[in-house]
Curated annotation (Swiss-Prot):
The gene is aat. Its EC number is 2.3.2.6. This is Leucyl/phenylalanyl-tRNA--protein transferase. GO terms for biological process: protein catabolic process. PANTHER family: LEUCYL/PHENYLALANYL-TRNA--PROTEIN TRANSFERASE (PTHR30098), LEUCYL_PHENYLALANYL-TRNA--PROTEIN TRANSFERASE (PTHR30098:SF2). One of its GO terms (cellular component) is cytoplasm. It comes from Salmonella paratyphi B (strain ATCC BAA-1250 / SPB7). It is an enzyme of class 2 (transferase).
Length: 234
């Protein structure tokens, strides 16, 4: 299998089945981060992931990490915390601040480059990328963002500045997503944090089948309209 060099003059991608086994899922390099190319990528189970100074790299790993929202794992300690939660959770109130928080919360660096931030801000302006914000009073203490594909949500990154803030974002989002027809959350690559919340690995082929079906299923009307999803317990 060869790594494919993308053309700037075409937004077409090779089949994900041609991705490398090592490193797992690396499919192509180059191209750009235009909205049209990014949307084409997500529609085919592909996402960008690269470090500052590297070329744009495109991935479709096998297996794929996913979370069925109804299978979110709510631990006893998290349930106790949430029942007395000090947090307010909103949808699409502060996308720029959320992606900036995701880019800057890791001491060891981040894959969210300036170019990535600008590209996903454009997707947000076009109605394809969305954020969930967690607030304590007026302070943004956590959140997550991703890209919508019908009844499937492609989670990109999350951050937390206070206890259980990112868990709260995902917990509240899962409940709201289910109520409005959401079926599956793409977590891309499994890690210990997402695994602890209920994410599992499935074969890439199965993920692509789910994607093809779910991206044709719309969520309830006006689901992505900015609004408050959860208020702190009194």
């Amino acid at each position: 299998m060869r790594l494919v060099q993308l053309s700037r003059h075409s937004i077409a991608f090779p089949s994900p089945e041609g991705a490398l086994r090592e490193p797992n899922g690396l499919l192509a390099l180059g191209g750009d981060l235009s909205p049209a190319r990014l949307l084409m990528a997500y529609q085919h189970g592909i996402f960008p992931w690269f470090s500052p100074g590297d070329p744009i790299l495109w991935w479709s790993p096998d297996p794929r990490a996913v979370l069925w929202p109804e299978k979110f794992h709510l631990s006893r300690s998290m349930k106790r915390f949430h029942n007395a939660s000090p947090y307010r959770v909103t949808l699409n109130y502060a996308f720029d601040r959320v992606i900036d928080g995701c880019a800057n919360h890791r001491d060891e660096g981040t894959w969210i480059t300036r170019g990535i931030e600008e590209a996903y801000r454009r997707l947000h302006e076009l109605g394809h990328a969305h954020s969930i914000e967690v607030w304590r009073d007026r302070e943004l203490v956590g959140g997550m963002y991703g890209v919508s594909q019908g009844a499937l949500f492609c989670g990109e990154s999350m951050f937390s500045r206070q206890e259980n803030a990112s868990k709260t974002a995902l917990l509240v989002f899962c409940a709201e997503f289910i109520r409005h027809g959401g079926k599956l959350i793409d977590c891309q690559v499994l890690n210990s944090h997402t695994a602890s919340l209920g994410a599992i690995e499935i074969p890439r082929r199965d993920y692509l089948d789910h994607l093809a079906a779910l991206r044709q299923q719309p969520l309830a009307s006006r689901f992505w309209v900015p609004r408050t999803l959860f208020l702190p317990r009194k």
